Amino acid sequence: MNIAVNPKDPNTFASSCLDRTVKIWAIGSPVPNFTMDAHEKGVNYVEFYPGADKPYLVTTGDDKTVKVWDYLSKSCVQTMESHTNNVSFAVFHPNLPIIISGSEDGTIKIWNSGTYRLENTLNYGLERVWCVALRREGNEVAVGFDEGSVVLKVRLTGPLLL
């Protein structure tokens, strides 16, 4: 479970909840602006799309899915399925047209953020994947596992990838 501040409106944030919902809040308000029924099981992560052109969120859940939402219309744009266990996180890359997800199945998945097609699956044999950090100025992505961490240099080659 986490919270994410909207980069387009720093007075708005989203929270992911084990009750299967994502709530959108205004800073200072004791009640959410609205609640979205997001996943069939607990929601582990929520993140806003960093660009100005789309009002999107990405969420992950214990239902093994990654979902992209239009938070203005409160509708699911796409459900991405490929992980075989709870999905710990998913983030929009700030500079490249990809979504990066990590799961308790031990894999990192790279998705095309325009077509939502799975582009690559990485498995370093370090057990469950738990957390991610992006270097906004570059294309490095750090991923934390049960048994260590990996720093990836992500770049586009051909149609997409590492």
PLM segments and residue spans:
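WD40-repeat beta-propellers
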Residues: 3, 22-27, 46, 66-69, ...
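Conserved strand-to-loop turn within each blade of WD40 beta-propeller repeats
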Residues: 15-19, 59-63, 101-105, 144-147
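WD40/WD-repeat beta-propeller blade-loop signature
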Residues: 1, 9-12, 32, 42, ...
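Beta-strand initiation motifs
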Residues: 29-34, 73-77, 115-119, 159-162
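Solenoidal tandem-repeat scaffolds enriched in leucines and small polar residues
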Residues: 1-2, 6-12, 16-28, 34-35
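Loop/turn segments within WD40 beta-propeller blades
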Residues: 4-10, 28-29, 47-54, 70-73, ...
